[in-house]
């Protein structure tokens, strides 16, 4: 299967959400699935794993140091139909979660929300 995960937080942030996504990604990949991660970008961070795609982000003045995704990316808009996804999974109801729901509807794909 080709599985897309949309998340408002991913590496280099360490959190329960990130750990869960990485665990699912590792196991699903081990089972032969292709897992694509769509998350916010982090300045000066370079992903080590394949199939991680980043949305532009803003660093808002908050107590936590997690950039906020700007859910607009013409590149990702073109990429999503090309990878022939089977399912979209989102981990948040807002920002990239809403983007995931919209993309699932546009591409006529099932949406999983946890």
Language-model regions, residue ranges each:
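An amphipathic, basic-hydrophobic alpha-helix
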Residues: 61-87, 95-102, 106
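Short, well-ordered beta-to-alpha junction loops that form the rim of enzyme active sites
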Residues: 8, 92-93
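Histidine-centered active-site/metal-ligand motif
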Residues: 33, 89-92
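Residue-level recognition of alpha-helix initiation/capping sites
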Residues: 12, 19, 71, 94-95
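Active-site proximal beta-strand in glycosyltransferases
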Residues: 3, 87, 104-114
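Short, hinge-like loop/turn segments at secondary-structure boundaries
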Residues: 51-56, 70, 106-108
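Structural motif
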Residues: 38, 90-91, 114
């Amino acid at each position: 299967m080709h599985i897309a995960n949309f998340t408002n937080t991913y590496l280099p942030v360490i959190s329960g959400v990130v750990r869960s996504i990485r665990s699912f990604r590792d196991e699903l990949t081990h089972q032969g699935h292709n897992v694509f991660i769509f998350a916010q970008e982090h300045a000066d961070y370079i992903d080590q794993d394949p199939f991680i795609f980043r949305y532009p982000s803003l660093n808002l003045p908050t107590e936590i140091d997690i950039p906020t995704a700007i859910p607009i990316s013409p590149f990702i808009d073109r990429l999503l139909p090309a990878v022939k996804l089977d399912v979209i999974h989102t981990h948040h109801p807002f920002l990239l979660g809403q983007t995931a729901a919209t993309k699932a509807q546009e591409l006529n794909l099932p949406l999983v929300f946890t």
